[in-house]
């Protein structure tokens, strides 16, 4: 049985190293993509401060993301590739760090309380499987250290999991 440990880190790099270690232990021996996404979302939501949403969107067709496991308020179920922060991350095949979602062109307001967002694609080889999406009610909540940390989390998730 997995037991989450409180992370007491002096800086974000240390926080994400410890978070990655916990996630590796949590996902060890389990290949189911949905179960692993659910546990990853729960770990992120309960560990990282100042989030109002943490979860996954799954690329179910070449042009559409579908809501996957998450923690937080109910969310948009379908997002077209190219729309909003999640759709832009898939279309551009890169992480998107948005300090002010209200200034982002074509932002999709699934939760009016969200002010900043970090979206990281889940990539296996050349294929995008989906994205990890983090939202915060604070403007500029995320920085490059968060981006690097969540990109590492995404890699751990992809290596540990079968496709959706």
What are these regions (language model features)?
Residues 123-136:
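Sensory-domain boundary capping and coupling elements
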Residues 59-110:
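Regulatory sensory and allosteric helical modules in signal-transduction proteins
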Residues 53, 119, 131:
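Short hydrophobic/aromatic beta-strand element in the GNAT-like acyltransferase core
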Residues 139-146:
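A short acidic/glycine-rich loop-to-helix N-cap element
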Residues 73, 136-137:
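A short acidic/small-residue loop/turn micro-motif
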Residues 48, 110-114:
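Short loop/turn motifs at secondary-structure junctions and domain boundaries
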Residues 1-70, 152, 156-164:
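Intrinsically disordered, low-complexity terminal regulatory regions
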Residues 116-123:
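A short, aliphatic-rich beta-strand micro-motif
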């Amino acid at each position: 049985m997995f037991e989450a440990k409180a992370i007491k880190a002096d800086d974000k790099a240390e926080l994400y190293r410890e978070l990655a270690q916990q996630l590796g232990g949590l996902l060890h021996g389990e290949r189911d993509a949905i179960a692993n996404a659910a546990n990853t979302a729960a770990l992120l939501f309960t560990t990282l401060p100042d989030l109002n949403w943490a979860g996954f969107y799954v690329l179910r067709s070449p042009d559409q993301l579908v809501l996957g496991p998450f923690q937080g308020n109910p969310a948009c179920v379908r997002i077209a590739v190219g729309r909003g922060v999640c759709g832009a991350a898939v279309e551009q095949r890169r992480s998107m760090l948005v300090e002010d979602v209200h200034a982002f062109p074509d932002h999709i307001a699934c939760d009016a309380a969200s002010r900043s967002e970090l979206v990281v694609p889940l990539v296996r080889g050349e294929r995008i499987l989906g994205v990890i999406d983090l939202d915060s009610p604070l403007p500029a909540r995320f920085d490059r250290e968060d981006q690097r940390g969540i990109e590492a989390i995404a890699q751990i998730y992809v290596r540990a999991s079968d496709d959706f």
